[in-house]
């Protein structure tokens, strides 16, 4: 495990690349004291430490851009995400939580990289690399497409105005019509809320409901904010 700090380190291409990654991560996270480490179990966030995978031998190749994207997306999470609020909003149901997590990460990245083309390119490379490793990018049947990833890509299109990255369009198109038919209106409603994590997360529960997933708020699929005529009056506190 190698920590990158203010100490002098060798100027090999790998070390220069690590220092550049650490500097960029601190800037995006808006945390100048963020600890950045490199280890085989990265990427992960733990408290005030960001652990990234060990860089490839060639710091100029596609693997290096994907690693920059991993660093960027996690740094933006530190700057644009409230973990406490997320814990209160996140569904307990595993399938619903997967979709919730994917869409919240999409929000984080869209908000954080709105004017940063290079950061968006890096995160696109990381996304394509991850879905290729999962085997999802090569899917030829709708049932092989991870719902969470597909919903995240549909939200990404709405928040950024950009199509799915090259290599992922065919995957998302396999399920696009079905997901749009079921939850298109609810997905559209997310667009205006991207800068407000709480409002976005609350609206995201409507997306989950439209997809027949349990949002964890005790409301049924057809629930509305209007209590209706048969709703009992609230009891006075003791």
Please annotate each region the language model reported:
Residues 2-193, 200:
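Basic/hydrophobic alpha-helical interface regions
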Residues 218-238:
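Acidic, serine/threonine-rich intrinsically disordered low-complexity regions
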């Amino acid at each position: 495990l190698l920590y990158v700090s203010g100490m002098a380190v060798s100027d090999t291409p790998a070390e220069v690349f690590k220092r550049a990654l650490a500097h960029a991560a601190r800037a995006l996270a808006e945390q100048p004291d963020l600890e950045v480490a490199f280890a085989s179990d990265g990427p992960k966030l733990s408290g005030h430490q960001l652990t990234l995978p060990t860089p490839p031998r060639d710091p100029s190749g596609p693997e290096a851009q994907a690693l920059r994207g991993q660093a960027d997306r996690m740094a933006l999470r530190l700057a644009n995400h409230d973990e406490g609020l997320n814990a209160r909003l996140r569904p307990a149901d595993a399938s619903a939580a997967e979709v919730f997590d994917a869409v919240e990460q999409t929000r984080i990245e869209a908000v954080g990289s709105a004017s940063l083309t290079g950061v968006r390119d890096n995160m696109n490379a990381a996304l394509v690399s991850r879905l290729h490793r999962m085997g999802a990018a090569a899917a030829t049947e709708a049932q092989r497409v991870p719902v969470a990833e597909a919903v995240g890509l549909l939200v990404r299109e709405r928040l950024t105005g950009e199509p799915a990255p090259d290599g992922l369009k065919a995957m998302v198109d396999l399920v696009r019509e079905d997901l749009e038919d079921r939850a298109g209106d609810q997905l559209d409603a997310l667009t205006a809320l991207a800068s407000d994590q709480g409002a976005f997360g609350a609206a995201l529960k409507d997306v989950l409901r439209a997809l027949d997933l349990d949002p964890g708020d005790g409301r049924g699929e057809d629930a509305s904010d209007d209590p209706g005529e048969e709703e009992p009056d609230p009891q006075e506190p003791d």
